[in-house]
């Protein structure tokens, strides 16, 4: 994958437009989770150190296109950046017809989704973005799977289009895990439905040596193996699909599970052997014996890809399976990559972020890359690098 990299460019005196993913949760005008902003800071600092005039853009939320909405304004992000960088970061609402920026300046553009034509990737808007800069830097892996004006169109028309350090690191890490993984490779794919992760499961079945499944996905695989799953969430119409996937790759199944009679924070958890699951039981986690077996398997792996908690970890009584596997990944010498919103929440809960080799910032983009799909915003950077 050959793309121009921002780190290799001379940016002194250049106008640089950086597309970041600053789509963070905001409540009462305050940023609630700053992970994406923190991830973007090194790129912004580097551009300033290189002597550029820096303009940063992003989307936030899902406003009606072409209309300003206060709740989707990047104002709280501008305030956060000002504190983090120790300098005022002005938020510019009117920028499409040109802005005055000089070397050492840093400005944040208002939500790109307030601009008509952003989501449709309209040429007219993309050309306006491109006219603002000498160099366009795509650094938002989380939106790389969307061909929009500020992620794809601008890269077509800008004089120079490059990948930022964050995007480059994501592509390197995913390439290492999926392109030529050190073996044995284990993948953990968990979630409520096989249907939403079907392409991920099929793709990984052709790459990894062991495919650990969790959540509702595991229940469908258990049913495919002839086990009773009680009133657990599972997809009867995908039992044959689960069998086909299990025929391609080793899918170790739980030998014991944690069940409850209801899905609630106050639900009483009971550990049962898989053969003892009753008709009115809901499987809400893997059991301790299974967790120990899966942990041993992870400890011997050289590459681990993790997407999704294996139980309802938000309720502590159904979180032990996820905690055990999270710690096994953290303790492993393997190259480990984790991605997906719930996965990141589990990593935070168990305090293991420093011990995962790479944590992906992109949810949908992470999954689409794993599925083997082309990410439009990356593809255009490759095309531009070829000249």
From Swiss-Prot:
Gene3D superfamilies: Phosphoglycerate kinase, N-terminal domain. Pathway: Carbohydrate degradation; glycolysis; pyruvate from D-glyceraldehyde 3-phosphate: step 2/5. GO terms for biological process: gluconeogenesis; glycolytic process. It is found in: Cytoplasm. GO terms for cellular component: cytosol. It holds the Pfam family PGK. PROSITE patterns: PGLYCERATE_KINASE. Coiled coil: none annotated. Substrate binds at residues 21-23, 36, 59-62, 113, 146. One of its GO terms (molecular function) is ATP binding. Its EC number is 2.7.2.3. The keyword ATP-binding applies. Its main location: cytoplasm. InterPro entries: Phosphoglycerate_kinase, Phosphoglycerate_kinase_CS, Phosphoglycerate_kinase_N, Phosphoglycerate_kinase_sf. Belongs to the phosphoglycerate kinase family. HAMAP family: Phosphoglyc_kinase (MF_00145). This is Phosphoglycerate kinase.
């Amino acid at each position: 994958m050959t793309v121009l990299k921002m780190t290799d460019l001379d940016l002194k005196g250049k106008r640089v437009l950086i597309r970041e993913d600053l789509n963070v949760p905001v409540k009462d005008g305050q940023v609630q989770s700053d992970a994406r902003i923190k991830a973007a800071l090194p790129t912004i600092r580097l551009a300033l150190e290189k002597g550029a005039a820096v303009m940063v853009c992003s989307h936030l939320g899902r406003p009606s296109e072409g209309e300003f909405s206060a709740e989707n304004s990047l104002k709280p992000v501008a305030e956060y950046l000002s504190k983090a960088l120790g300098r005022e970061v002005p938020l510019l609402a009117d920028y499409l017809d040109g802005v005055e920026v000089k070397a050492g300046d840093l400005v944040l553009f208002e939500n790109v989704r307030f601009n008509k034509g952003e989501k449709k990737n309209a040429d007219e808007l993309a050309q306006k973005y491109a006219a603002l800069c000498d160099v366009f830097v795509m650094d938002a892996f989380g939106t790389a799977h969307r061909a929009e004006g500020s992620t794809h169109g601008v890269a077509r028309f800008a004089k120079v289009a490059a990948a930022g350090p964050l995007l480059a690191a994501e592509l390197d890490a995913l390439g290492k895990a999926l392109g030529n993984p050190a073996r044995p490779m284990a993948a953990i794919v968990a979630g409520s439905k096989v249907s939403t992760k079907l392409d991920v499961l099929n793709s990984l079945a052709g790459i990894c040596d062991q495919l650990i499944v969790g959540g509702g996905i595991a229940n469908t695989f258990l049913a495919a193996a002839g086990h009773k799953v009680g009133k657990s969430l599972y997809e009867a119409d995908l039992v044959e699909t689960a069998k086909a996937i299990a025929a391609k790759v080793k899918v170790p199944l739980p030998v014991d599970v944690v069940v409850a009679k209801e899905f609630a924070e106050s639900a009483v958890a009971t550990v049962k052997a898989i053969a003892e699951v009753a008709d009115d039981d809901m499987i809400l986690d893997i059991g301790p014996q299974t967790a120990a077996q899966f942990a041993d398997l992870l400890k011997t792996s050289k590459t681990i890809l993790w997407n999704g908690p294996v139980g309802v970890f938000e309720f502590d009584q159904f979180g032990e399976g996820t905690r055990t596997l999270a710690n096994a990944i953290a303790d492993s010498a393997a190259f480990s990559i984790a991605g997906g919103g719930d996965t990141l929440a589990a990593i935070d809960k168990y305090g293991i972020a420093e011990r995962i080799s790479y944590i992906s910032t992109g949810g949908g983009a992470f999954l689409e890359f794993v599925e083997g799909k082309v990410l439009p915003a990356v593809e255009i950077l490759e095309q531009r690098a070829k000249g």
